[in-house]
Amino acid sequence: MRAAGFGAGLITALLDILKGAGAVWLAQAINPGSHWVHTFAPIFAILGHNYSIFLPDFDENRRFKGLRGGAGGAPTVGGAFGLWPTSLAIILPLGALVFFTTGYASVTTMSVALFAIIVFAIRAASGLPWIDVLYGVLAGILLVWALRPNIKNLLAGTERVVNISLHGWLKAKREAAKPKP
């Protein structure tokens, strides 16, 4: 959304959510009897999102450094949606609350995995598969790993804050109130 605008960002986010959900749906179609396969399919979608073969990274001497990609937040939400569609109605509003309160996209991204863990743990406590909790844990590990630079920025107080959030608004208000030299 930062680079291409709101519309392109929204379409990209929706397609990335479908990437995670589609992995589950494809696994369910190919192997309907194995919930383990359904649970691990979106993990591989997240890995493919974070380390895309279509985004190789090279140094200044054109030597291969690795694969680039996103952090995996949207495919994580999509994977949760694919495993249990109602999870979307829980995770998205909570993620929006985190985003519009903190103003940090990285914190929001990490929180969606935490929300998936909580949602699936509550479901598992009522007799549904515990393997879905493992999905949330593994997705969370992948998200935290991908967001290591952002975590460093958060700890240093240099992470970018979105102005449309409560935190961003308060920060802008404090800066505007500072006396000018």
Give the predicted meaning of each segment.
Residues A125-L134, W145-N153:
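Glycine-rich phosphate/pyrophosphate-binding loop and the adjoining helix
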Residues L94-G95, G140-L142:
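Membrane-cytosol interface at the C-terminal ends of transmembrane alpha helices
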Residues L138-G140, W169-L170:
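C-terminal all-alpha effector/ligand-binding and dimerization domain
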Residues M1-A21, N50-A74, F100-S111, A146-P181:
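Interhelical loop and helix-boundary elements at the membrane-water interface
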Residues M1-G5, A27-N31, G70-T102, F115-A124:
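Interfacial segments of multi-pass membrane proteins
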Residues A89-I90, A105-A113, G127-A139:
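Loop-to-transmembrane alpha-helix initiation sites
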Residues A8-L14, K19-F64, G82-T86, G95-A96, ...:
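Nucleotide and nucleotide-moiety/phosphate-recognizing core
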